[in-house]
Amino acid sequence: MMSPTHTPDLVVDARAMLPPEPLERTLEALDALPEGGTLLLIIPRQPAPLYDMLVNNGYTYEVKTRDDGAFDILIRQAEQAHGDG
């Protein structure tokens, strides 16, 4: 069960999607993400190209492996204090 304090604002369940749809849906969801919000991406494989895109566009992410072998990737905007100058 997900903790109520960590309920994401948006969820993209990409387990049944084929590339490049998971990446496209994730980018669309990030555009719609409210300030300070979080996006949960559920995906059956590590989306390596997405990680660089997230970091380069000011997001941080946490990856956890699900019991079914898929990945939960929690994405949020990086805090300004941690930004690179």
Over which residues does each language-model region extend?
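Short, low-complexity, intrinsically disordered N-terminal peptides in bacterial proteins
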Residues: 1-7, 80-85
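Amphipathic, hydrophobic secondary-structure cores in small proteins
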Residues: 14-65
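Intrinsic-disorder/low-complexity, polar/charged segments enriched in Ser/Thr/Lys/Arg/Asp/Glu/Gln
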Residues: 7-9, 36-40, 70-72
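Small-residue-biased structural context
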Residues: 1-4, 15-18, 25, 74-76
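C-terminal edge-of-domain segments
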Residues: 61-85
